[in-house]
């Protein structure tokens, strides 16, 4: 099997994933998964598509990850891994889509408007 690559985005985070056959090692920006994401919840989020397909020990994954915060990065990585797994085996798409791993979450920060302190917040109104 050749190396399969995929891209995942969430908020400002971008994850480029390179999947090859291996032993289940996930390397993010030349660091181990547990070192990059110390939180077990974020590690769980990243591994969700692999666990769903019971493929956690089948593939080695190298990741270039930049932008955003921890949560956005972990969710961008989850999307990228799911897309790469579908490229490897298209029959897995329905199983991953039913869990919501194939959907790009398009929500992002709303821009600040002029004449207001924030996107929705208005300056304090004084009646008198």
Curated annotation (Swiss-Prot):
Gene Ontology process terms (BP): translation
GO cellular component, one term: cytosolic small ribosomal subunit
Key words, A-Z: Ribonucleoprotein, Ribosomal protein
Gene3D superfamilies documented for this protein: 3.30.230.10
A molecular function (GO) term: structural constituent of ribosome
Disulphide connectivity of cysteines: none
Pfam family of the protein (one): Ribosomal_S9
Biased composition (Basic residues): 114-128
Region called Disordered, residue ranges: 97-128
Ranges of compositional bias, category Basic and acidic residues: 97-113
Stored InterPro entries: Ribosomal_Su5_D2-typ_SF, Ribosomal_uS9, Ribosomal_uS9_bac/plastid, Ribosomal_uS9_CS, Ribsml_uS5_D2-typ_fold_subgr
Family: Belongs to the universal ribosomal protein uS9 family.
Protein name: Small ribosomal subunit protein uS9
Organism: Phocaeicola vulgatus (strain ATCC 8482 / DSM 1447 / JCM 5826 / CCUG 4940 / NBRC 14291 / NCTC 11154)
């Amino acid at each position: 099997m050749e190396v399969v690559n995929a891209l995942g985005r969430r908020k400002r985070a971008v994850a480029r994933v390179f999947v090859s056959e291996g032993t289940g090692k996930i390397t993010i920006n030349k660091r181990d998964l547990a070192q990059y994401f110390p939180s077990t919840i974020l590690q769980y989020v990243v591994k969700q598509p692999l666990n769903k397909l019971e493929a956690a020990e089948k593939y080695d994954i190298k990741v270039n990850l930049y932008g955003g915060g921890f949560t956005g990065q972990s969710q961008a990585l989850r999307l990228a891994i799911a897309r790469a797994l579908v490229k490897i085996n298209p029959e897995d798409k329905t199983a991953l889509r039913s869990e919501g791993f194939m959907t790009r979450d398009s929500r992002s920060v709303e821009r600040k408007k002029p004449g207001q302190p924030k996107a929705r917040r208005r300056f304090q109104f004084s009646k008198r």
